[in-house]
Amino acid sequence: MVKVGINGFGRIGRNFLRAALGNPALQIVAINDLTDSKTLAHLLKHDSLLGKLPAPVEAADGALQVDGQRIVVFSERDPANIPWREAGVDVVIEATGFFTEREKAAVHVTHCGAKRVIISAPGKNDDLTVVMGVNHDRYDPAQHVVVSNGSCTTNGLAPAAQVLHQQFGIEHGLMNTTHAYTNSQALHDQPEKDLRGARAAALSIVPYSSGAAKALGKVIPSLDGKLTGYSLRVPVPVVSIVDLTVTLSRNVTAEEVNDAFRSAAASGPLKGILGYSDEPLVSSDYQGDPRSSIIDGLSTLVIGGNMVKILAWYDNEWGFSNRLVDLAVLMDKKGL
């Protein structure tokens, strides 16, 4: 069983804990967050998107009691001071969003006694970026100490792109993610460096940059430089959708494309990670879906023989958090 510490108990930190509950291969033993234990307990127990946690949660002095298990809570601003070693932490989930550079994230290992770090965001100079089901087999404990789980959008894009590339070959393409608003945005207009990002999140469709297509090259090297794209933040709290348009190496039909997705979703390394649906569903139907990417088969289009457009739904919090759990367990099995 791998013992995990969470640095940053925000949306992803709390989703990760919920996803990990009851998993016999993983135990959360410590949390570091600047917020007091009472507030952390309340936000874990009562979630506006996930509902009430179906397990008892209590706050104690310097700890949380979750489903009968004690989780020690630290409150260190500097990661170098977090006593992970004392808590017996093997793997740290770096979920603050602030320490995404390798040098900063590695402090959990070099100064604090953890064995590995998983960054819950795109990393900078990280040892390896992993998208489960796509390139998880590349993890090598002899080489990889600071590992990134990529972004929720990279996890939504990569499985679909891999299937298309393996089956038909991708020449180049464009991606847009119609993305739920996040905590980086504000309820009302306020000064920001990004003047579009300065606007009220719930009142507009807000164009944003997205590094998901560029990051895809770190996960599928043969697609490096072949995709680019952006994001449109929209007034929904969760669930996003990747719109991917690619030029393939050969002519195809929509049915061929959908058959490839059905097959990949049913068996092999993408089973349970990639999904496929022919139902006429909307974003709210995918809230709480643990898969990384669900192909909307009704929306697959082909024009000119080899230009293809597909849509892939993803719960940008819950699906991503489940992959964090999977990655921590995988790293423990392969060696820390």
Question: Where would I find each of the regions flagged by the language model?
Answer:
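C-terminal active-site/capping subdomain that shapes the small-molecule cofactor and substrate pocket
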Residues: G229, I241, T245-L336
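Generic structural signal for residues in well-ordered beta-strands
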Residues: I71-V73, L227, I310
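Small-molecule pocket liners
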Residues: L128, L203, V242
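Conserved active-site and cofactor/substrate-binding residues in soluble primary-metabolism enzymes
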Residues: N7, R11, T35-K38, A87, ...
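Acidic, glycine-rich segments within the central catalytic cores of soluble metabolic enzymes
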Residues: Q166-P237
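N-terminal Rossmann-like NAD(P) cofactor-binding subdomain of oxidoreductases
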Residues: M1-A198, V302, D326, K334-G335
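A broad structural signal for alpha-helix termini and local helix breaks/kinks
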Residues: T96, C112, F168, I220-P221, ...
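Short clusters of hydrophobic/aromatic residues that line enzyme substrate/ligand-binding pockets
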Residues: L64, V130-M132, V146, L187-H188, ...
